[in-house]
Amino acid sequence: MYLGSWLNRLGRGLSRPIGKTKQPIWGSLSRSLTLSSQRVPEFSSFVARTNTCGELRSSHLGQEVTLCGWIQYRRQNTFLVLRDCHGLVQILIPQDESAASVRRTLCEAPVESVVRVSGTVIARPLGQENPKMPTGEIEIKAKTAELLNACKKLPFEIKDFVKKTEALRLQYRYLDLRSSQMQHNLRLRSQMVMKMREYLCTLHGFVDIETPTLFKRTPGGAKEFLVPSREPGRFYSLPQSPQQFKQLLMVGGLDRYFQVARCYRDEGSRPDRQPEFTQIDIEMSFVDQTGIQHLVEGLLHYSWPEDKDPLVAPFPSMTFAEALATYGTDKPDTRFGMKIVDISDVFRNTEIRFLQDALAKPQGTVKAICVHEGAKYLRKEDIEFIRKFAAHHFSQEVLPIFLNARKNWSSPFAKFITEEERLELTRLMEIQEDDMVLLTAGQHEKACSLLGKLRLECADLLETRGLALRDPALFSFLWVLDFPLFLAKEESPTELESAHHPFTAPHPGDIHLLYTEPEKVRGQHYDLVLNGNEIGGGSIRIHDAQLQRYILETLLKEDVKLLSHLLQALDYGAPPHGGIALGLDRLVCLVTGAPSIRDVIAFPKSYRGHDLMSNAPDTVSPEDLKPYHIHVSWPTDSEERASATPSKYLSS
């Protein structure tokens, strides 16, 4: 009987009209097309149910409904709560003998079993309504029930308040996905991507184009994953971004490109990164930096969740030099102050030795931050941690100065600070009672970077003491501009490397410096920062083949043969173009307030890059490797061999 009724319902669902579709003329596409966000979705079409568990209300009283879902919990064999991805509803289990089979099915099915229940929507008895549930005014009086799949004992309960280790969650990811938080995160992600696609493609004429996943190794950037081919010694690589392809699409006249792109970077064990990730990839012809910024601001405003405060555009901006000097980083969190102040002039005639030594050197400076109420809330062990952090990570000394409630200065160096220096320092730093000043000295960039780190450490410490510095409901966007085009290599300071990638165009006002002082050239690169996190980066590209060849070959010492296809394309009439990539995982993580990007990805890797559910990466037998002309040799060192846990299929 259940199969027959199910087929009848399915037939009705298939015959139901999906909705009228318009056939607009191409020229008026953006004016005529009905956006999908304006339609009411039908969640029960084409399936064996009439409604979802979360949609029933008092307006449905008396209706006969069929629901499908998981048994959330059962109480005294009288009620059970049925759950699907749309919500919860209470099922009243019949107690009369005529419905014994229904009662047996619903009472004997283990929790998390999948059932289909048909019945009548009735009002809950007066006083038994549950205001915490959207369906709390009604319940379903069950008439028929079918066990679709019984559930075995679970490794953990599917309840948000049940604490589970991340390793266990990743091992049983398909169970973790049933939680309301994961459901919310993934559905919000889907909605944001849908709105982004509408904004770009429907409203602004972008073309959604897939680019290849199998490519070749290219110079610069992050390490790439290699994919063997059947030709001896020849490998593909998984692209770290569609950078070259989207530039070639501009050469091909596509004008406006967009893609929800999968990208791959072999960066090893990093807790905040994934070896595979998703970015909203954008490229435009005949655009400048301002045009890209306006596009992205409109894109985020359009796709922003409705339950959040609307974004205010344009976003503020600052140069890389300003960000470093003020916040000590190129991705500042501007939700709170504690800005870096240059106090070199205050201590020009100081008797404090390490300040004297720093100011005597070229580009030597004295910098400080004021930690409001730091003297009141930070403890002795906190200050010791700060000083050790500075010494270990930056090989620099930090001088703490406290102003207590009686306006007395407390510091190991207090006796060496003159009254004039105190007054000027108080004025510049706007020091108040119970504040703490952290002071350091050295080369400008190093001193700023140290204080930028300490600024965040102090914010963390103060928030653990109960001070609210960073409002989680506030979304503070910032454009950072005018990055250096090149950086000195760490391993060889006399050589240059690209600060971002070698295709970034130099600032028009600095092109002449390419041939004399390339280290001073600014690039037309821009980063989008949200609450101290880089969520996007892009640039105006080099569209002149001669300039691109000069930068690759002469300045970066790269083998231009690896990029001959791109250089040739630029020679064939490449338009001026630029673009940006937004990190979708990071953006959704910040919007949802998730603790990790792994909480907004359906099937993420662990921080070591492993899939704990399937145990990937896995070993491969010699027979499977033979067509690729690959032989695995294990390390000879016994400890390395033990840590590698070799498979029985692979021998040295």
Curated annotation (Swiss-Prot):
The keyword Transit peptide applies. It catalyses: tRNA(Asp) + L-aspartate + ATP = L-aspartyl-tRNA(Asp) + AMP + diphosphate. InterPro entries: Aa-tRNA-synt_II, aa-tRNA-synth_II, aa-tRNA-synth_II/BPL/LPL, Asp-tRNA-ligase_1, Asp-tRNA-ligase_1_N, Asp/Asn-tRNA-synth_IIb, AspRS_core, GAD-like_sf. Keywords: Aminoacyl-tRNA synthetase, ATP-binding, Ligase, Membrane, Mitochondrion, Nucleotide-binding, Phosphoprotein, Protein biosynthesis, Transit peptide. GO terms for biological process: aspartyl-tRNA aminoacylation; mitochondrial asparaginyl-tRNA aminoacylation; tRNA aminoacylation. ATP binds at residues 265-267, 534, 583-586. Its main location: mitochondrion. The modification Phosphothreonine is found at residue 218. It is an enzyme of class 6 (ligase). Pfam families: GAD, tRNA-synt_2, tRNA_anti-codon. It comes from the Eukaryota. L-aspartate binds at residues 265, 541. The modification Phosphoserine is found at residue 241. The keyword Lipoprotein does not apply. Its EC number is 6.1.1.12. One of its GO terms (cellular component) is mitochondrial membrane. GO terms for molecular function: aspartate-tRNA ligase activity; aspartate-tRNA(Asn) ligase activity; ATP binding; nucleic acid binding; protein homodimerization activity. SUPFAM superfamilies: Class II aaRS and biotin synthetases, GAD domain-like, Nucleic acid-binding proteins. It is found in: Mitochondrion matrix; Mitochondrion membrane. Residues 1-46 form a transit peptide. Residues 243-246 are annotated as: Aspartate. Homodimer. Catalyzes the attachment of aspartate to tRNA(Asp) in a two-step reaction: aspartate is first activated by ATP to form Asp-AMP and then transferred to the acceptor end of tRNA(Asp). Belongs to the class-II aminoacyl-tRNA synthetase family. Type 1 subfamily. This is Aspartate--tRNA ligase, mitochondrial. It comes from Rattus norvegicus.
